[in-house]
Structure formats: structure tokens, C-alpha cells
A protein has these predicted regions:
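Interfaces and regulatory segments of ATP-dependent nucleotide/adenylate/phosphodiester-chemistry enzymes
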Residues: 115
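Long, low-complexity, Lys/Arg-enriched
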Residues: 1-109, 120-365
Length: 365
């Protein structure tokens, strides 16, 4: 089994009835319908669980559905603990991470619902749970409808033939990181930026302005279902101005294929880490934020950054489809495998070199 095969992740359909009563559910009181998806499923099926960490976003946004979340949560969980995540200052969440670890001591499984989480919060939270000596389920529900619809995009494009419209978010506030997700490795070396393009070209533009990257790799999402294929061309058109900063190299992958994303990011890292500082930004889908966490733990020298927007558009997503689940029998053990990946990979390379040397000697004789 290769080093990559030992850290493969499996995404399967999630059954709420399969969860024991003694879980700690971690979710966000966001503005999307899918922020309430798990709670709705639990209520529909009459399920009760032990405890919940409910995360409220700052700065305050009236579109976030805290009251709805709280009302449903009180009918599902025996204990609810509220915590605050400041999108503009993710470092402030450190104390909450310690408290979440303390709360986990009284349960048999932790369930992290990334469906409506900020992508930076996904990385910050999973990284903060690295020492969790328990089973962990990462659950994710796609939205039923993703904005903008094609007609809205075409209308905006026609009005702004020279400028790029942006959807879903307003302008970028600043680029953030945290102490544990940053890296001082390769100081002074040229920088490679890896990001996932979306409908707001200002996000990656802000990354390039902030970091002065010499190389830009864009991981584009291949649309599923096929009727959404127009979105890739739209995102390319919206982000076309990035070439005024640096000409990007583009790759395509299925955003929901965790292992394909890990393998692609690993390939880019291997090609450039000896000569460049590697920065990675989780600007893509929620599951790609999970793979960003994996890469950071495979290679601690990777520098994680994220462009925080001021606010989100009224129309972002609609509806909530069925949950899928990444189930890990022991999260700390899995993180250890990620950490040991570098050693296993070096061992594989050494064996390849030794076999090549033996073949060369054989040919000489």
C-alpha cells in the first residue's frame, strides 16, 4: 500500500439513525438552509442527542438564522454550548477549540457539520481537533440550488463587458491566517499560491496582492451534474483578469472527490516545495477545505491563508440535499497518518532509487 493510499478518505451517504445518542455535534448558525439541515432531519426522525456546540458568526449579520437554529437545537440536544467565530480574526477561536476538546471527553463521537461553515473555519476547527482521541464524522450536505443562476450571470456579463461582475459576496476585507496554520518555512523564497477559483475574482486577486506570489495554480471544479457545466466557463471568464498579476496554471478536478483533490495538491507541492514557499487557500468547496486541512498536516511547511469578504449576498444557496459523511474511527490516529506521510513517502522514494541502482548494476555485469 502506497503512502497516499494509507490516507485515503471515503465519502458515503450518512444515516442520522446510525449516530449514537452520546455525540457532540458541531454546527454553525449560518444563513443557508443547510445550516439547519441536520437539525431538521433529527426532528423529522425523532432523534435526540447529548450535546451541541453551536457556532455564531461575527461580525453580526442579520441574515444568519441563530433564532431558528437555537429553537431546533433545544428540541434535539440535551446540552447546547454557544461559541463565537469572528471571520475577520480566526485566531480568536483558539480558546473555543480548547473548550470543545474538554466537552468531547463526555461523548463517544464528534460530528462536525461543514455544510454551512466558513471554509476557513473548517480548516481552523479540524486543525484544532488534531488530538481528538475519538471517532469523528465530518458530514456535508450540498445545496439544492447554487447561485447565481445562468440567466443572472448572462445578464450581468452583458452589462459589464469590460469589468468582471462578482456574485455571492461583496468586496474582500482582508487576508487572514492563524498562528498554527501559518508557516515561516522558506522565508525569502519565491511563493507559489494554490487556490480554487469561484464567482468572486476579488478573492484570489486579494491573495496575489497580499502575498506577491510568483506562481499561481488554480484548481477548477468540474461541474456535476452536467447541466451546471456552464459554471466552469463562467468562473474562468470572471477570473480572466488574474493574468494581469501572474499567468495561472489551471487543473480540473471534481470538488467532491476528496482523494483526487489530495493527490492533485500533493503533486503541485512535490513539484515546487524545494524551491518555493507554498501557500494554499481554501477558496473552493467545503470538502476542498477538508483536503486543505489534510495537506497542511501532511506538510506543515504549507502556509494557509484566506481572503475574508465583508458580507455575503442575499442569494447564495437554496435548499439542502442529503448528507454525506467522512467517518474516521479515531481522528488522532488519522492525523498521525497524515503527519507520517512524509516519512513513508521518503521511504518509497528511497526504495525506488535502490531498485533502480540494483538494475543498473545488473546491466553493467
Amino acid at each position: 500500500m502506497t503512502a497516499l493510499e494509507q490516507i485515503r478518505l471515503s465519502l458515503k451517504h450518512s444515516e442520522i439513525n446510525a449516530f449514537p445518542h452520546e455525540i457532540l455535534y458541531i454546527g454553525v448558525a449560518g444563513f443557508e438552509d443547510r445550516a439547519l439541515g441536520f437539525l431538521k432531519s433529527a426532528l423529522d426522525q425523532g432523534k435526540k442527542f447529548q450535546s451541541c456546540v453551536a457556532i455564531e458568526y461575527q461580525p453580526f449579520d442579520p441574515s444568519n438564522r441563530k433564532a431558528e437554529f437555537a429553537d431546533s437545537a433545544t428540541r434535539v440536544f440535551g446540552d447546547i454550548q454557544w461559541r463565537t467565530y469572528n471571520r475577520f480574526s480566526p485566531e480568536d477561536f483558539t480558546q473555543s477549540l480548547h473548550e470543545i476538546m474538554d466537552l468531547s471527553r463526555s461523548v463517544s463521537r464528534v460530528v462536525v457539520d461543514v455544510s454551512a461553515m466558513s471554509k476557513m473555519l473548517v480548516v481552523v476547527l479540524l486543525h484544532g481537533l488534531r488530538e481528538l482521541n475519538l471517532p469523528l464524522s465530518i458530514i456535508y450536505a450540498p445545496a439544492e440550488i447554487y447561485h447565481p443562476p445562468k440567466d443572472d450571470y448572462e445578464k450581468a456579463k452583458a452589462k459589464l463587458s469590460d469589468a468582471s461582475p462578482y456574485f455571492l459576496t461583496t468586496d474582500v476585507y482582508k487576508v487572514v491566517t492563524t498562528t498554527t496554520l501559518s508557516s515561516i518555512a522558506m522565508q525569502g523564497a519565491p511563493l507559489v499560491m494554490i487556490a480554487f477559483p469561484n464567482f468572486n475574482h476579488l478573492e484570489i486577486a486579494a491573495l496575489l496582492n497580499e502575498t506577491n506570489a510568483q506562481k499561481l495554480f488554480l484548481v477548477e471544479s468540474v461541474a456535476r451534474p452536467k447541466q451546471d457545466a456552464w459554471r466552469l466557463d463562467a468562473i474562468r471568464w470572471i477570473n480572466r483578469g488574474l493574468k494581469t498579476y501572474v499567468t495561472p496554471t489551471c487543473y480540473q478536478t471534481d470538488a467532491s472527490d476528496l482523494n483526487a483533490n489530495i493527490e492533485l495538491l500533493e503533486s503541485i507541492y512535490n513539484d515546487w516545495h524545494l524551491t518555493h514557499k507554498i501557500a494554499l487557500s481554501p477558496t473552493g468547496g467545503k470538502l476542498q477545505a477538508v483536503t486543505t486541512f489534510c495537506l497542511k498536516n501532511m506538510h506543515p511547511d504549507i502556509h494557509i491563508v484566506y481572503p475574508v469578504v465583508r458580507k455575503f449576498a442575499k442569494d447564495y444557496t437554496e435548499g439542502c440535499l442529503a448528507h454525506s459523511e467522512i467517518s474516521l474511527q479515531n481522528f488522532r490516529d488519522y492525523v498521525t497518518k497524515l503527519d507520517q506521510y512524509r516519512k513513508r513517502r521518503l521511504s518509497e522514494i528511497k526504495q525506488i532509487i535502490e531498485r533502480a541502482g540494483q538494475k543498473a548494476v545488473g546491466k553493467i555485469w
